[in-house]
C-alpha cells in the first residue's frame, strides 16, 4: 500500500545524493591495496557470532522499532532451487539500518553488500564490515578494478549480494528513485537472478504510537527476475533494469498512471515527489 507522510525532511535535488553526515573517525585508503573482500578466518568467526546476535538482538530490535512486517518469504522457498547458485537482492534505501530488515527477510542467508565509502570511515564501520559491507572506491581506476573483482568473486562463488541501487538513503521517502544500472550489469554478466525487495510505510496506530512517531515499515519480497540470455549483455542489462524499476514501484502500490509512477531512470531528470 502506498503511504506517505510529511516528516519535515528536506530531500536533496539529485536522487543519488546523500542526506546524512557521517562523523569521520578514521582515514582509510580505499585504493588497489585495500582488502575489499575479507576472507580471513577471524572474519568468518565474527560472522558466526553475528548470526547469533542478529537472531537474539538485531532482528527483534528492528521489528519493534519499525513495526516491521515481511511479505513474500514464501517466494524464496518456492524458488529455492533457482536461487541455489546465488542471487542479487535490491531494495529502496529509506532509513538507517534498513539493511537489517533485508537480512531478516532473507534469513538464514548472510550477504555481502557494496556501500558508500564514507560509512566505512565513521563510527559504524566495524559493524558494516561484519554484516558484509564492501566500500565502493571513487577517483581511482585501479581501486575500482579491484572492487569489481571482489564483487565478481562473491557472485562466482555462489554467494548472495545486496545492492541499494538508488545510490543513497532518503529517510522515509515513499517513492522509488531511479536505479543505477551497474547492479543489473553484474546480474547479466554472471547470469544471476535479481530479487526485488521494497519497503513501504503505514501509519502508526494504537500501541505503536507509544514507541515512536515515524511511519511503520512493510517489506515486500518480489519474484526473482532473470537476465535474458538470448540478448547481449548490454541489452539484457537494460531489460532487467527497466523490469526491476517497474516492479519495485508496483510492489509499493505505485502503478502506471499514478502521479508519482516514473519510467525515466536518468538521474538528472528525476524530480523528487515531496
Task: State the predicted function of each range.
Residues 81-141:
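Catalytic core of membrane glycerolipid acyltransferases/transacylases, capturing the structured
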Residues 1-30, 145-274:
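Non-catalytic C-terminal accessory region of glycerolipid acyltransferases
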Residues 70, 113, 133-135, 194-196, ...:
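Conserved beta-strand scaffold positions in the cores of enzyme catalytic domains, especially
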Residues 70-73, 121, 145-148:
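Structural motif corresponding to alpha-helix initiation and N-cap regions
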Residues 1-88, 97-101, 268-274:
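Membrane-anchoring hydrophobic helices of lipid-metabolizing enzymes
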Residues 74, 141, 200:
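Residue-level "edge-of-site" marker
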Residues 64, 109, 130-131, 157-158, ...:
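Structured helix-beta-strand junction loops
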Residues 47, 114, 140-141, 172-174:
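A generic secondary-structure micro-motif detector
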Amino acid at each position: 500500500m502506498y503511504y506517505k507522510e510529511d516528516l519535515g525532511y528536506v530531500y536533496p535535488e539529485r536522487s543519488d545524493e546523500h542526506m546524512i553526515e557521517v562523523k569521520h573517525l578514521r582515514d582509510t585508503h580505499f585504493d588497489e591495496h585495500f582488502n575489499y573482500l575479507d576472507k580471513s578466518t577471524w572474519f568468518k568467526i565474527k560472522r558466526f557470532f553475528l548470526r547469533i546476535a542478529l537472531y537474539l538482538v538485531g532482528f527483534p530490535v528492528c521489528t519493534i522499532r519499525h513495526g516491521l512486517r515481511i511479505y513474500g518469504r514464501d517466494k524464496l522457498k518456492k524458488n529455492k532451487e533457482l536461487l541455489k547458485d546465488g542471487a542479487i537482492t535490491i531494495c529502496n534505501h529509506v532509513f538507517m539500518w534498513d539493511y537489517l530488515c533485508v537480512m531478516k527477510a532473507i534469513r538464514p542467508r548472510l550477504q555481502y553488500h557494496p556501500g558508500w565509502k564514507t560509512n566505512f570511515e565513521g563510527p559504524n564501520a566495524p559493524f558494516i564490515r561484519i554484516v558484509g559491507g564492501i566500500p565502493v572506491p571513487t577517483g581511482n581506476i585501479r581501486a575500482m578494478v579491484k572492487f569489481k573483482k571482489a564483487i565478481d568473486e562473491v557472485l562466482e562463488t555462489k554467494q548472495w549480494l545486496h545492492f541499494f541501487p538508488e545510490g543513497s538513503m532518503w529517510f522515509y521517502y515513499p517513492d522509488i528513485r531511479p536505479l543505477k544500472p551497474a547492479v543489473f550489469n553484474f546480474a547479466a554478466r554472471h547470469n544471476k537472478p535479481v530479487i526485488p525487495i521494497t519497503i513501504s510505510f503505514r501509519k502508526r496506530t494504537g500501541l505503536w504510537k507509544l514507541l515512536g512517531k515515524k511511519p511503520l515499515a512493510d517489506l515486500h519480497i518480489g519474484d526473482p527476475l532473470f537476465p535474458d540470455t538470448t540478448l547481449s549483455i548490454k541489452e539484457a542489462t537494460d531489460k532487467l533494469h527497466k523490469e526491476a524499476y517497474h516492479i519495485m514501484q508496483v510492489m509499493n502500490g505505485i502503478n502506471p498512471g499514478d502521479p508519482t509512477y516514473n519510467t525515466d531512470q536518468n538521474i538528472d531528470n528525476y524530480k523528487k515527489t515531496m
